Amino acid sequence: MAVEEIVKVSRNYQVTIPAKVRQKFQIKEGDLVKVTFDESGGVVKIQLLDSKTDAH
């Protein structure tokens, strides 16, 4: 099931991952995420990485 929330971009171009999303995917402070922008569809995708294997 998809979880959607609307977030606002802050002054420093930061966004906060909403609590519902953090809880559902067990995202914690210090976790790594990969941000991808798909120009063809105007979609930004955030992927949670395994910090032990996906760091680089």
Swiss-Prot record:
The keyword DNA-binding applies. Keywords: DNA-binding. It holds the Pfam family MazE_antitoxin. Residues 4-51 form the SpoVT-AbrB domain. InterPro entries: Repressor-like_regulatory, SpoVT-AbrB_dom, SpoVT-AbrB_sf. GO terms for molecular function: DNA binding. NCBIfam families: lp_hng_hel_AbrB. This is Repressor-like protein SSo7c4.
